[in-house]
């Protein structure tokens, strides 16, 4: 109880105002406190519950404040009306939830309830109101999410959630296999919470996962994708991904409904072969999977870079890629093959074409970036000119941003080989140089710095003339300046008149 005593010491009977952790620790915020007070005055039990209690116990400021109560939905609506509060029926009859709006914030107030699960892989088939707080806490997924607190700061911890927080351990409420079989999405939530909280999964939790794998086939792609995205942008995404892959969850499939029929969508089976895959020790400290996790951890927590990091070496060890040359393990072509695999994965995940193609470009070009960054004789400007001519990017700024992303990925790739941050200095300088080259390289005629009279000079061959000017600038035959473009336009017009 030592940890909790530090947190609850700032709670007083009549104080519900928010307070910063620097000044007084964390307390129940004003709106939640008012709701708990109103419930108590009406003779009802009321507690903050779930993630907000967990966050308080970890010294964090909760983002959401959920409340559980003995009051039925109609009673909660009556209490809200008596206080002049805005209240929304959030599925009261079925789920017992009323949403109270106070100070511009929404508070979900839910009646104590129990749940029975059936054929649906995620939603309960039957929800009934419970009589006690303990019954309500028993239905929750993990011990750290199954704690409640009253308005006076008293903690209700029936399942050892506080102890698990102190031990940085994620453990299921009761039997892990039963909890996962009830709601298969909890499998992905377990991976996410491990990543978000920097916890270790309890051995009982890991053992309980496999029995629920058949239920994953009934989960929607949308739900799984949401959990995956939240996992990947977590600070400790490597922990969560390691659990996802090593447990076997990555080899399962969810589903999507299209044209009236369900289609199977594999999670991420392509990653499984990387576990334990050896790499040439001269260049790599870790096997292919630990390397991938290290790269993932070394990138900034944004979806684009995290997906690129996760998939950048996905083709290593594949037939036709893995070979032994002169006694060394090699994976020549893994960047190109990996780009194809990344496109397949993100397409089946129904990611946007723009997002998919940028991840694909990063995966496909990460080895090329390493080569150019380490080869002073390589013609970097030629690379930029070719990209501009091939219309790979919509603008010069988009090309510059992509090179900065590629720089960050490749720096993480170096760190993931077990090398220090100082080893990335050359890549940092080269990436910034490539971004600057890109900003000076026009991708479309709109980025040519021509004077206003050039279109009139080129008429009636404006489109052809502009494309000619753009091509010459991209080839390095013409400067992108008003004077040079004006003279070139005059010469083009003269040739077409003659």
Please name every model-derived segment.
Residues 1-498:
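Catalytic cores of the polymerase beta-like nucleotidyltransferase superfamily
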């Amino acid at each position: 109880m030592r940890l909790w005593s530090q947190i609850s010491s700032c709670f007083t009977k009549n104080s519900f105002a928010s307070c910063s952790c620097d000044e007084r620790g964390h307390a129940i915020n004003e709106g939640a406190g008012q709701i708990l007070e109103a419930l108590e005055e009406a003779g009802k039990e009321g507690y903050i519950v779930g993630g907000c209690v967990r966050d308080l116990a970890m010294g964090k400021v909760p983002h959401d404040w959920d409340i559980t109560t003995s009051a039925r939905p109609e009673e909660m609506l009556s209490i809200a009306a008596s206080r002049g509060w805005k209240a929304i029926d959030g599925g009261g009859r079925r789920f017992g939830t009323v949403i109270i709006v106070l100070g511009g914030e929404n508070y979900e107030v839910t009646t104590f309830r129990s749940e029975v699960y059936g054929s649906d892989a995620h939603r309960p088939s039957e929800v009934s109101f419970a009589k006690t707080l303990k019954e309500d806490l028993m239905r929750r997924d993990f011990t750290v999410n199954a704690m409640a607190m009253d308005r006076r700061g008293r903690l209700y911890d029936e399942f050892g959630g506080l102890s698990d927080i102190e031990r940085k351990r994620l453990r299921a409420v009761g039997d892990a296999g039963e909890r996962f079989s009830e709601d298969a999405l909890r499998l992905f939530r377990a991976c996410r919470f491990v990543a978000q909280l920097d916890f270790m999964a309890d051995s009982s939790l890991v053992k309980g996962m496999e029995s629920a794998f058949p239920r994953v086939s009934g989960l929607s792609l949308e739900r799984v994708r949401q959990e995956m995205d939240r996992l990947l942008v977590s600070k400790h995404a490597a922990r969560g991904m390691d659990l996802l892959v090593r447990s076997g969850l990555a080899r399962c499939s969810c589903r999507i409904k299209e044209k009236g029929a369900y289609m199977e969508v594999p999670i991420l089976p392509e990653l499984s072969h990387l576990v334990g895959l050896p790499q040439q020790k001269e260049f790599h400290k870790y096997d292919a999977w630990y390397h991938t996790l290290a790269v993932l951890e070394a990138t900034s927590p944004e979806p684009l870079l995290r997906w690129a990091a996760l998939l950048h070496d996905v083709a290593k060890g594949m037939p036709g890629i893995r070979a032994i040359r002169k006694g060394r393990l090699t994976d020549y072509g893994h960047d190109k093959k990996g780009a194809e695999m990344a496109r397949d994965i993100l397409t089946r995940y129904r990611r946007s074409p723009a997002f998919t193609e940028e991840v694909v470009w990063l995966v496909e070009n990460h080895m090329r970036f390493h080569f150019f960054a380490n080869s002073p004789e390589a013609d970097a400007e030629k690379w930029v000119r070719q990209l501009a001519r091939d219309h790979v990017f919509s603008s010069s700024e988009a090309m510059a941003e992509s090179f900065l992303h590629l720089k960050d990925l490749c720096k993480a790739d170096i760190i993931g080989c077990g090398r220090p941050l100082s080893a990335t200095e050359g890549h940092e300088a080269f990436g910034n140089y490539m971004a600057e080259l890109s900003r000076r390289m026009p991708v479309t005629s709109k980025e040519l710095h021509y004077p206003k009279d050039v279109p009139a000079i080129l008429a009636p061959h404006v489109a052809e003339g502009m494309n000619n000017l753009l091509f010459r600038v991209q080839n390095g035959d013409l400067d992108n300046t008003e004077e040079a473009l004006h003279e070139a336009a005059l010469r083009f017009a003269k040739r077409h008149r003659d």
